[in-house]
């Protein structure tokens, strides 16, 4: 399954592992993964949560409190590697199922967020519900960000909002009067050139 993760998903899993190690926790749990999604550099999950009408910062504070409450280990396992707990694995399995229903070829961070929203057993799912983050709102926010694009590469997050970032909406500029009035008036410009070029 790991070969079907996007780069940002792999990065989030690695960040979750790093956070669990840093805090000397007994295992890597779903809460570590969600914290990694919230703190990921240029992450998509905070944008989706904010567009869904909640505060990603408020959720982050709740998750940090939950991480602080987890028990710590006095020493690391013999092999030095922490184990992923069952909930962590279940979230990834659920995310894979969600990716399949959206006809995406790779498991991306938005699929993991949707898996957390669907999960009513964890405190994360309950917190998201309390703050009004629903599956429909996230799917609408996702449609705003990625349009009708499917996840067909391992780095789709780089393509999201590319048009907004590197292009401009000419129709919107025309409506607001920001567009030069000459644009789109080729016939008028040719007529003026013909008149001016006469002797």
Residue positions per predicted region:
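Histone-fold recognition with a strong bias for associated Lys/Arg-rich disordered tails
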Residues: 1-199
């Amino acid at each position: 399954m790991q070969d079907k993760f996007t780069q940002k998903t792999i990065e989030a899993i690695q960040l979750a592992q790093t956070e669990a190690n840093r805090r000397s926790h007994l295992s890597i749990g779903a809460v570590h993964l969600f914290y990694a999604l919230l703190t990921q550099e240029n992450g998509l999950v905070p944008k989706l949560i904010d567009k869904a009408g909640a505060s990603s910062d408020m959720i982050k504070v709740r998750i940090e409190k939950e991480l602080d409450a987890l028990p710590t280990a006095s020493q690391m396992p013999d092999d030095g590697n922490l184990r992923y707990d069952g909930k962590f694995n279940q979230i990834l399995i659920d995310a894979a199922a969600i990716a399949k229903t959206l006809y995406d070829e790779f498991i991306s961070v938005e699929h993991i967020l949707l898996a957390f929203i669907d999960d009513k057993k964890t405190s994360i799912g309950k917190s998201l519900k309390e703050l009004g983050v629903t599956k429909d709102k996230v799917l609408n926010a996702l449609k705003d960000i990625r349009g009708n694009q499917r996840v067909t590469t391992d780095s789709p997050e780089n393509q999201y909002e590319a048009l907004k970032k590197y292009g401009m909406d000419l129709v919107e500029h025309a409506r607001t009067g920001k567009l030069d009035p000459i644009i789109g008036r080729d016939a008028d410009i040719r007529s003026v050139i013909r008149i001016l070029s006469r002797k």
